Amino acid sequence: MRAYNFCAGPAALPTAVLEKAQQELLDWQGKGLSIMEMSHRSADYVAVAEKAEADLRKLMNIPENYKVLFLQGGASLQFSAIPLNLLGKNNKADYIHTGIWSEKALKEAKRYGDINVVEAGIKVDGKFAISEQSEWNLSDDAAYVHYADNETIGGLQFAGVPDVKAPLVCDFSSSILSAPLDVSKFGLIYAGAQKNIGPAGLTIVIIRDDLLDQAKAEIPSILKYADQAKNGSMVNTPSTYAWYLSGLVFEWLLEQGGVDAIHKVNLEKAQLLYGYIDSSDFYNNPIAIPNRSIMNVPFTLADEALEKQFLKEAEENHLLNLAGHRSVGGMRASIYNAVPLEGVQALIRFMDDFAKRNG
């Protein structure tokens, strides 16, 4: 049987997608070869790539004045690529700091420009939260404002989209496609694929056309968004299999009814899990309710000494990858689009049984 996988990334993929990939692995659509063996310049592969982009545009209602790039190097490479591409004419940017991933982004950006750090992570009644925008010290002349919508490690998520004058740049790695989004509010959106899009090895960048000419002169051409846009994300050989698999995930999402439909399921999963944790004396979630992530749910046990036992027994019950990130400890259930409601129900049953036996 397939276990329920709560890994933060690389994360669960829909079973139907894996089955289709398995079916097509040796002989893609009667062509006598695997898509992994196919030239990225072939008409067949270009059609696969173009369909994946078209389906993503449909899922996210991406306006025509935005380019969609399928890149490599993970979201972490974009921590450098973004300032290199967007600070060519104005060397200043604002970075909103709410946790570990937004901190990694701003540390890289500081190597390339004058970065104003907006400290927005706060504590409210002992719980982690994000401060009101009225309290942020934003610059008047920033080239862009950067934030991470969902701090995957901390389980801290923005309750809405910040309203700023400068182009808004956002890391959506762990929340893309989980809820409806107005792409037109952003200058640039980026996301590593290995959480809600597909397997590791692919990074999506969605950039507004007017930002394609802002790059620093010395930027490597492989990192230059304008060059990638001009070459259909194929300045060099792309991650062909990851791109194909992501396309299958987009097809699957459309079959589920699109982002609106999957968002309803995601809310149900999150409400069930948080509801159980809040009703329990044995488990605790450290995040203020308005800023709780619907994708990454961290929690601690009443007795830290029981953590190893909890993880061992969870695995015996086919509930995998529930350990929190090494930097914060505790537990974390990542309940991305591909984690079914039944998986969350099974997790809650196990948590309840464990609490009764050890509380």
Swiss-Prot record:
Keywords: Amino-acid biosynthesis, Aminotransferase, Cytoplasm, Pyridoxal phosphate, Pyridoxine biosynthesis, Serine biosynthesis, Transferase. Its main location: cytoplasm. GO terms for cellular component: cytoplasm. It catalyses: O-phospho-L-serine + 2-oxoglutarate = 3-phosphooxypyruvate + L-glutamate; 4-(phosphooxy)-L-threonine + 2-oxoglutarate = (R)-3-hydroxy-2-oxo-4-phosphooxybutanoate + L-glutamate. It is found in: Cytoplasm. Pfam families: Aminotran_5 (PF00266). InterPro entries: Aminotrans_V_dom, Aminotrans_V_PyrdxlP_BS, Pser_aminoTfrase, PyrdxlP-dep_Trfase, PyrdxlP-dep_Trfase_major, PyrdxlP-dep_Trfase_small. Its cofactor is pyridoxal 5'-phosphate. It comes from Acinetobacter baumannii (strain ACICU). Binds 1 pyridoxal phosphate per subunit. It comes from the Bacteria. GO terms for molecular function: O-phospho-L-serine:2-oxoglutarate aminotransferase activity; pyridoxal phosphate binding. This is Phosphoserine aminotransferase. One of its GO terms (biological process) is L-serine biosynthetic process. The modification N6-(pyridoxal phosphate)lysine is found at residue 195. L-glutamate binds at residue 41.
